[in-house]
């Protein structure tokens, strides 16, 4: 469904998410820990920005072809090895940020690199995944999310560990950001590109 960031919500519903066994017959420890909090999740939705998929009331729609093509374009620009088949995987997430209890992720490519200040920075993996719901507040036994960005396609680029001073790390982030903007296929603006440093 077409995501539009909205501040007005005409629909509200609640859920309790529980840890369940995976296809391998095991329960994810992080999911089990989260389920011990016994939170009731309250979701706010606007029909302009979310549909029954985001409410987990109908099956997921087909993969967004434009998002897949953008992930392939970025993978090529980073000289990554693109897989001949892309499969949808499910990551268990029961903190309430996803109504289904899992996030859909696709491993698109591995390897590759970018040049920064004359040094080669390796790429570990490139994934296409979906964004989570936006946390509004967490109080007592309730957690509140808006669904206006749930399911928005994201390209996740994991780089090799980097050694260097903070300026070099900043230069890597700037170089990667510029590469993404050159595609003219990614959202621009504050908060549209998120970069985590671990």
Where are these regions (language model features)?
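Basic, nucleic-acid-interacting segments
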Residues: 1-198
């Amino acid at each position: 469904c077409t995501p539009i960031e909205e501040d007005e919500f005409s629909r509200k519903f609640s859920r309790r998410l529980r840890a369940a066994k995976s296809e391998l017959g095991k329960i994810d420890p992080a999911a089990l820990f989260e389920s011990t909090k016994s939170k009731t999740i309250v979701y706010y939705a606007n029909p302009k920005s979310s549909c029954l998929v985001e409410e987990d009331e109908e099956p997921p729609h087909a993969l967004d072809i434009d998002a897949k093509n953008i992930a392939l374009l970025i993978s090529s620009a980073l000289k990554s090895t693109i897989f001949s088949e892309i499969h949808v995987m499910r990551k268990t997430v029961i903190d309430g940020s996803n109504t289904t209890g899992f996030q859909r992720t696709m491993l698109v490519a591995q390897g590759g690199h970018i040049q920064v200040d004359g040094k080669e920075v390796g790429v570990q993996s490139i994934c296409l995944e979906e964004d989570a719901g936006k946390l509004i507040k967490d109080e007592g036994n309730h957690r509140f999310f808006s669904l206006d960005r749930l399911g928005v396609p994201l390209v996740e680029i994991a780089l090799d560990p980097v050694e260097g001073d903070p300026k070099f790390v900043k230069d890597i982030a700037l170089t990667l950001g510029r590469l993404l903007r050159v595609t003219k296929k990614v959202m621009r603006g504050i908060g549209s590109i998120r970069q985590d440093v671990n």
